[in-house]
UniProtKB/Swiss-Prot annotation:
The gene is rpmC. This is Large ribosomal subunit protein uL29. One of its GO terms (cellular component) is cytosolic large ribosomal subunit. GO terms for molecular function: structural constituent of ribosome. GO terms for biological process: translation. HAMAP family: Ribosomal_uL29 (MF_00374). The lineage of its organism: Bacteria, Bacillati, Bacillota, Bacilli, Lactobacillales.
Amino acid sequence: MKLSETKSLLKDLRALSVEELTTREAELKKELFDLRFQAAAGRLENTAKLDEVKKTIARVKTVQAELNK
């Protein structure tokens, strides 16, 4: 993910409410589960997607922590 894409994603995440962030995190965790299952089955072609989803989950959690301060 390019820096400009990351900044855009963070801007979008900061515009969301706490409930929307929680929903987004749950969606990402389900996507990560599905990707891990595909990787274990040998059907995942783009393995970089795993790292991207993990980092996005971390970004969502960071924004949630910022809102809880």
